[in-house]
Design a protein with these regions (language model features):
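Bacterial N-terminal signal peptides
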Residues: 8-18
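Bacterial N-terminal signal peptides that target proteins for export
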Residues: 1-9
Length: 177
């Protein structure tokens, strides 16, 4: 499941802030919602996020083994059978800094292209974001849709319940510069 993807994308929207100093990410949460047949929905989240920056991009990495859907057996199946976390322990999103231009204060919304790596396969991703800048603190709300089949993840199903291929990934971050 492409749950971890969300955390990565929002951090990328902070490139304009780096000129003012280093960034510290706090209160970061990445969540996912996977919908299935028969009205089924599976939600999960993690707060384990690592952000790296170079001259051209932000790279956000999440340990896929930290995802928690509040149901131990389901988590075990997701991590072992579908995400194969021993073989693919992380998911990564990379966003180009050139796309990001946050104001010194106020709000901004937009979309940025990037790449998302899950299950060892890297594919394009478009991240929608909203940012609120107040002094040295920026709150970011970002999301994108991850497609399991594009990342080589087999159809997710348990008994008669099947999960749709599109998984919504969402991240909320507070960043201080």
């Amino acid at each position: 499941m492409n749950i971890t993807v969300r955390i990565f994308a929002p951090v990328a929207f902070l490139s304009a802030l780096t000129a003012a100093g280093p960034l510290a990410v706090s209160n970061g949460t990445v969540s996912f919602t996977a919908k299935g047949n028969m009205g089924m929905s599976c939600d999960g989240s993690t707060s384990a996020v690592k952000v790296d920056e170079d001259a051209s991009a932000y790279t956000v990495t999440v340990q896929t083994g930290t995802l928690d859907s509040k149901l131990e057996l389901r988590d075990k199946h997701i991590k072992e059978r579908f995400l194969e976390t021993p073989k693919f322990p992380t998911s990564v999103i990379v966003i180009d800094k050139a796309c990001l231009a946050l104001p010194e204060s106020g709000d901004k919304a937009g979309e940025c292209p990037g790449t998302f790596t899950l299950h060892g396969q890297t594919k394009p991703a478009t991240v929608k974001f909203k940012a609120k800048v107040a002094g040295k603190v920026t709150e970011i709300d970002a999301s994108f849709t991850a497609h399991m089949a594009q990342h080589g993840i087999e159809e997710v199903k348990w008994a008669m319940v099947k999960i749709k291929d599109d998984v919504e990934v969402h991240a909320k971050l507070t960043v201080t510069r």
